[in-house]
Amino acid sequence: MTPTLTRVTEQVDRQTFWRGWLDAHLPAEMAGKLTGVVEREGALVIFAESSAWSARLRYAVQEIEAQIRASGPGITEVSVRVLPRGAKA
């Protein structure tokens, strides 16, 4: 596998891991409003479909941030942003 393909594969694996992890640790209605998640350079960025859901998600993430960091030891920052459905990260 080429280095680029390896990096992309690892990135997809991390997105899949975090999406499943968040689905399991957030309330079902909130997990359904996630539009993406990206782990990059020690930062975990969680995307919500609207600004209203982003605000609610920020509070929920604050409550589980210690668990997030325990599950991803390299995570030094967790943030929530808006990414409407159908938009590209």
Specify the residue positions occupied by each region the protein language model found.
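N-terminal presequence-like segments and adjacent domain-start helices
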Residues: 1-28, 32-41, 62, 70-89
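A short interface-forming secondary-structure element
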Residues: 41-61, 87
